[in-house]
From Swiss-Prot:
It is found in: Virion. The lineage of its organism: Viruses, Duplodnaviria, Heunggongvirae, Uroviricota, Caudoviricetes. The gene is gp47. Disulfide bonds: none annotated. The N-terminus is cleaved by ribosomal processing protease Prp. GO terms for cellular component: viral capsid. This is Major capsid protein. The keyword Hydrolase does not apply.
């Protein structure tokens, strides 16, 4: 039996110092070649910037860096005070309260259906086109949960729930007295309002607020400020005309621990996205694809007493789940 001679190869002979690993270039790679993964920093950064510029929680709240999906806090509920001490006298022990709290991040997802032609876009073209839609979906969902306790809020806390706990509610119209009384609800607990959350439909009501003695208006439409404090407008049908929230927003804390991840699907039926006739969108049948993007966000409220709300006199403020 003849033995087969095996060719001995010197693999180093085929190696070349000039051969470099291929670098991912978003301008050359088509979306149908890269249907999932972690979004590149050059696209994540502008999306997060747009989210932070438009989210009312992120505009007004206090950012806390996070390295994981959970962060533990220790802070003063009642800060220690100082005492006058005479010569030879014993220094009194200050009464203070430490509070331990945990802020946990939850995954926030958005599904955006688009035509199949989008798969022929380059990675850069695709995410440049989708960037504003991704950002808007993220900040609207986060604000509705953290401010109004809407949309299956996973945090277990929100400004609406804090107001419900403390019953810091003023019922009435947009008048100077009611605005002062609203701010006073915080001052009673040695807190100070530093902003208002309103909506665009309230601007005509705000412009009508007049000091009865000086006849001056306390709303400045040029700077969008009320009683010297900034007013931000929340775009949500769940905040009604005639409702106004104020608070010490230093007590509202948020975090963003992870980058944005994405996946493109071509076959799913989207139960949460409807056609004009009310039927679910079927990607395969309708020759579409869907982008699913996810990010983690965290929220914590350090003091429930830091928020109050003005509502119309006939507005119900109890026994309505998820509403205040």
């Amino acid at each position: 039996m003849e033995q087969t001679q095996k060719l001995k190869l010197n693999l180093q002979h085929f190696a070349s110092n000039n051969v470099k690993p291929q670098v991912f270039n978003p301008d050359n790679v088509m979306m149908h070649e890269k249907k999932d993964g972690t979004l590149m920093n050059e696209f994540t950064t502008p999306i997060l910037q747009e989210v932070m510029e438009n989210s009312k929680i992120m505009q007004l709240g206090k950012y806390e860096p996070m390295e994981g999906t959970e962060k533990k806090f220790t802070f003063w509920a009642d800060k220690p005070g100082a005492y006058w001490v005479g010569e030879g006298q014993k220094i009194e022990t200050s009464k203070a309260t430490w509070v331990n709290a945990t802020m946990r991040a939850f995954k926030l997802g958005v599904i955006l259906p688009v035509t199949k032609e989008f798969l022929n876009y380059t990675y850069s073209q695709f995410f440049e086109e989708m960037k504003p839609m991704i950002a808007e979906a993220f900040y609207k969902k986060f604000d509705e949960a953290g401010i109004l306790n809407q949309g299956n809020n996973p945090f277990g806390k929100s400004i609406a729930q804090s107001i419900e706990k403390t019953n810091k509610v003023i019922k009435g119209d947009f008048t100077q007295d009611n605005i002062i009384d609203l701010e006073a609800l915080l001052e009673d607990d040695e807190l100070e309002a530093n902003a208002f959350i309103s909506k665009t439909q309230n601007r005509s009501l705000l412009r009508k607020i007049v000091d009865p003695e000086t006849k001056e208006r306390i709303y400045d439409r040029n700077s969008d400020s009320l009683d010297g404090l900034p007013v931000v407008n929340l775009k949500s049908s769940n905040l009604k005309r005639g409702e106004l929230i104020t608070g010490d927003f230093d007590k509202l804390i948020y975090g963003i621990p992870q980058l944005i991840e994405y996946k493109i699907d071509e076959t799913a039926q989207l139960s949460t996205v409807k056609n004009e006739d009310g039927t679910p969108v079927n990607l395969f049948e309708q020759d579409m694809v869907a982008l699913r993007a996810t990010m983690h966000v965290a929220l914590h409220i350090a003091d429930d007493k830091a928020f109050a709300k003005l509502v119309p006199a006939d507005k119900r403020t109890d026994s309505v789940p998820g509403e205040v």
